[in-house]
Structures are given as structure tokens and as C-alpha cells.
Curated annotation (Swiss-Prot):
UniProt-recorded Gene Ontology molecular function terms: metalloendopeptidase activity; RNA endonuclease activity; zinc ion binding
Main subcellular location: cytoplasm
Database matches in NCBIfam families: rRNA maturation RNase YbeY (TIGR00043)
Cofactor annotation remark: Binds 1 zinc ion.
Role of this protein: Single strand-specific metallo-endoribonuclease involved in late-stage 70S ribosome quality control and in maturation of the 3' terminus of the 16S rRNA.
Protein name per the record: Endoribonuclease YbeY
Gene Ontology cellular component terms for the protein in this record: cytoplasm
Requisite cofactors: Zn(2+)
Classification of source organism: Bacteria, Bacillati, Bacillota, Bacilli, Bacillales
Annotated source species: Bacillus velezensis (strain DSM 23117 / BGSC 10A6 / LMG 26770 / FZB42)
Enzyme Commission number(s) from the entry: 3.1.-.-
Biological process, per Gene Ontology: rRNA processing
Length: 157
């Protein structure tokens, strides 16, 4: 089973090793979550300013955030199922702020890689339909995140 992952670091500030680790982590998460073989996801690393613009334009919040996901396979009300649904799905896009990743790693006292992995998994779970709008959803999603990261070996220490 293999996830097709396109990772672009627009900031040129994240090491090739860290980007490769994100790819391995997302492959691991996809396998654990039973994601269809050859499903596609993109990960883009941006600056605080870039993610602030995206957050403002798409969420109405004029402030930087750590990660934003755009699921492409969600069907809303009154939407017709896409023809060719037997094709591997394009799950969507995960956009991560390198600046916020660094800030939060320092704030929480763990490595940049742990924070980057956390944000990648958080965004990936959103693409799979997980959310944290209610207490129950939050508990389910955050527990899933922790389990995936711990099992992969990217713990908070």
C-alpha cells in the first residue's frame, strides 16, 4: 500500500531529512487508517505570512495558524458523486507554517521534527474526515493523533 505524496517546502527552511520523515510518517498513518492504495495528498510548507493569507481568505481569520487542510474528496449536501469514483482518491492539501512549527516546538519543549510530524498527522486526519468541533470529536481525533505518533516513535519528549 502506498500513498502518493507531493511535498513542497516553499520556505526552503526544512531539511530534506525532515521532509522525508514527514513522508514516511504519512505513509505509516495511511496504512494504519486503511487509506486506499495510490491515494494522493500534497503537503506544502509555507511562511507565517503565507498561511495568514490563506487563513484570512478561506477561513475569515486574519492571523497565522499552524496547519490548514483542504479535503478534496468531501461531498457536501446536494453534491453529486464524482464519476470515476473507483479511481484512487485525491485526499487534499495540507499546508503547514514552518515559522509556527518552530515557535510551537520551542513553546512545547520538543523537537522541530516532533511538531512537524504532529501537524502533518493532524492535517492528514482532517483530510480523512476527522474533526474537533465537539468534545467527542476532539477526544477521538486527538487520541488518534497521539496513538499514531507514539506508535511511529515520534513522542513528545
Amino acid at each position: 500500500m502506498s500513498l502518493l505524496i507531493d511535498i513542497v517546502d516553499e520556505t526552503n527552511s526544512v531539511s530534506a531529512d525532515a521532509l522525508q520523515e514527514v513522508e514516511k510518517l504519512l505513509q505509516f498513518a495511511a496504512e494504519k487508517e486503511g487509506v486506499q492504495d495510490q491515494a494522493e495528498v500534497s503537503v506544502t510548507i509555507v511562511t507565517n505570512e503565507e498561511i495568514r493569507e490563506i487563513n484570512r481568505d478561506y477561513r475569515g481569520k486574519d492571523t497565522p495558524t499552524d496547519v490548514i487542510s483542504f479535503a478534496l474528496e468531501e461531498e457536501g449536501e446536494d453534491e453529486v458523486e464524482i464519476v470515476g469514483a473507483d479511481m484512487p482518491p485525491v485526499l487534499g492539501d495540507i499546508i503547514i507554517s514552518a515559522d509556527r512549527t518552530k515557535e510551537q516546538a520551542e513553546e512545547y519543549g520538543h523537537s522541530f521534527m516532533r511538531e512537524l510530524g504532529f501537524l502533518a498527522v493532524h492535517g492528514f486526519l482532517h483530510l480523512l474526515g476527522y474533526d474537533h468541533m465537539t468534545k467527542e470529536e476532539e477526544e477521538e481525533m486527538f487520541s488518534k493523533q497521539k496513538d499514531l505518533l507514539d506508535e511511529y516513535g515520534l513522542t513528545r519528549s
